């Protein structure tokens, strides 16, 4: 007798929660020190005459809590392509030519590391989720990555463009659903971000653009996600994903916008972004943790997208968080800057490494439950509930 639809459906689904089975990160070799960046930025964009603006930018960089950032764009390249250094010069072709090649390439570097840690043959990868804010092309970076890694042609791909800074949470939410609804699925998740599409010179009429120039940087991170790890071949979760939610914050229209134009990708930020996030964050926490009976936010380990120091400061104050709660987040902001969607995956990596180094009892700084937040255009907030594993 043929199996019933219910039996088929049950057989298709995994038994346990999705877990992160490997993490890898990569950055371009070229990096800039934040203390030196204002002088470099105003020189390379031929803007040294804008002395007041340069002072403002210096203050932004000083307050950013960033020590260094990695960037694919070098001084030599920018000198050869002056249109990218102007505030509003048509330059999309030049920018596109960079990102359609470099985004998948940097993604591959991170993916190779994640696959190595996972320790299984890449032929076991069933799904690819690729996320980037830049470089729309057909076929996309998901296809390029599949070719670069030599994955099976039958791998099931999903390409996410133009999401912005919350998307590190989005890819985890999607990977969780893919892994838990497809028995044996192993999902390669890649976030690869290159600022070549947003870099531009200063404008005294658009100070919000300068905020992005002070914060944004390049990086890629990759994860392998799967349910029911096969311990006989050495699969072991680093973190498990328990639930995932997305919401649009009230009264936040236009708080963060990005527009792809002939001049590249322009970013527009309202000052009140930290206020909007801190005002609404407790509602997201309540909805995520009430089912678990958790209401002490200091009992969680924290992985928050470091949009900028003001967001972290205001969230800490609003929730009464102890200073050490944002340690991993602030460390990644300091050493890498705001790498958009890749940031939270870098923070996951930093947290489990530091937890092991410090001899903590779990991958989550010795704690059992944690939260991962993504914030970005919308304002959109992604909330992922994480469960650590014993070390």
From Swiss-Prot:
Pathway: Secondary metabolite biosynthesis; flavonoid biosynthesis. InterPro entries: Chalcone/stilbene_synt_C, Chalcone/stilbene_synt_N, Chalcone/stilbene_synthase_AS, Polyketide_synthase_type-III, Thiolase-like. Pfam families: Chal_sti_synt_C (PF02797), Chal_sti_synt_N (PF00195). The active site is at residue 165. The keyword Transferase applies. Belongs to the thiolase-like superfamily. Chalcone/stilbene synthases family. This is Chalcone synthase.
């Amino acid at each position: 007798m043929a199996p019933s639809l219910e039996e088929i459906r049950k057989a298709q689904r995994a038994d346990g929660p999705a877990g992160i089975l490997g993490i890898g990160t990569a950055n371009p070799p070229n990096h800039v020190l934040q203390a030196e960046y204002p002088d470099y930025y105003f020189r390379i964009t031929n803007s040294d005459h804008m002395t007041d603006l340069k002072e403002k930018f210096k203050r932004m960089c000083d307050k950013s809590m960033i020590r260094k950032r990695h960037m694919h764009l070098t001084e030599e390249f920018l000198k050869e392509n002056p249109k990218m250094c102007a505030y509003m010069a048509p330059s999309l072709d030049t920018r596109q030519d960079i990102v359609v090649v470099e985004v998948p390439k940097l993604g591959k570097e991170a993916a190779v590391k994640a696959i190595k840690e996972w320790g299984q043959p890449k032929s076991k990868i069933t799904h690819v989720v690729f996320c980037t804010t830049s470089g729309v092309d057909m076929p996309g970076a998901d296809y390029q990555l599949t070719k670069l890694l030599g994955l099976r042609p039958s791998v099931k791909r999903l390409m996410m463009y133009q999401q912005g800074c919350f998307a590190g949470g989005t890819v985890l939410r999607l990977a969780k659903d893919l892994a838990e609804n497809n028995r044996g699925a192993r999902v390669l998740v890649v976030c690869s971000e290159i600022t070549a599409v947003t870099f531009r010179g200063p404008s005294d009429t658009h100070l919000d653009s300068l905020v992005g120039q002070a914060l944004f940087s390049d990086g890629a991170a990759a994860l392998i996600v799967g349910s029911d790890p096969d311990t006989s071949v050495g699969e072991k979760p680093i973190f498990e994903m328990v639930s995932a939610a997305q919401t649009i914050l009230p009264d936040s229209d236009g708080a963060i916008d990005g527009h792809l134009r002939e001049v590249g990708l322009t970013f527009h930020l309202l000052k009140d972004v930290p206020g909007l996030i801190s005002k609404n964050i407790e509602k997201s926490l309540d909805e995520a943790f009430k089912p678990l009976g958790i209401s002490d936010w200091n009992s969680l380990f924290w992985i928050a997208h470091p949009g900028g120091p003001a967001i972290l400061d205001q969230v800490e104050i609003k929730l009464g968080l102890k200073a050490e709660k944002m340690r991993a987040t602030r460390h990644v902001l300091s050493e890498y800057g705001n790498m958009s969607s890749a940031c939270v995956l870098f923070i996951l990596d930093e947290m489990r490494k530091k937890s092991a180094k410090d001899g903590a009892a779990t991958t989550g700084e010795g704690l059992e439950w944690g939260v991962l937040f993504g914030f970005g255009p919308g304002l959109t907030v992604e909330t992922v509930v994480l469960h650590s594993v014993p070390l």
